[in-house]
Amino acid sequence: AFIAYSVGNRPGEEKPPVPKVPGMVMAGTDDGIIPPAASQEIFDGMNPPKYFVSIDGAGHLVFSDICLIGRDQGGLVGLIGEVGLDLPESMTRLASDGCEDGQLDPAKAFPAIDHLSVAFLRYSLGIDPEPVGLDPAVTKNLTDAKVTLTVDPG
């Protein structure tokens, strides 16, 4: 089993072989690093059983706690600037995508990301004989963020 958080191929890049194991792909709809359509394309090409999680308004870093580091000091980019280092534009974008005003606060998505990741792995690895907490309706109970789960059991 595998989980891919914000995944995609670069234009012109050869597509990797399709895994023959259950998979889950998660993407933020406001990801400026890997377009959500690229993650959707990976999901579309996967073998079932497969799961796709879309997090509305979330950027690239929604799947990490990087946005929480030095939040009150301008985040990671602010901290780097504070110590006098220059960060190339490409790295500035990467270090802030998902942490900016107008994007979903990543901490609001953590409960859904954590729950769906664990539920998927428990089922896929045989710990749970039937899916538990992998129904699309469950996302409404996890967070006030809009999280959409698409399931293709095969």
Report residues per predicted region.
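The feature captures the conserved acid-bearing segment of alpha/beta-hydrolase catalytic domains
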Residues: 1-63
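Alpha/beta-hydrolase-fold serine-hydrolase catalytic core, especially in secreted/extracellular enzymes
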Residues: 48, 66-154
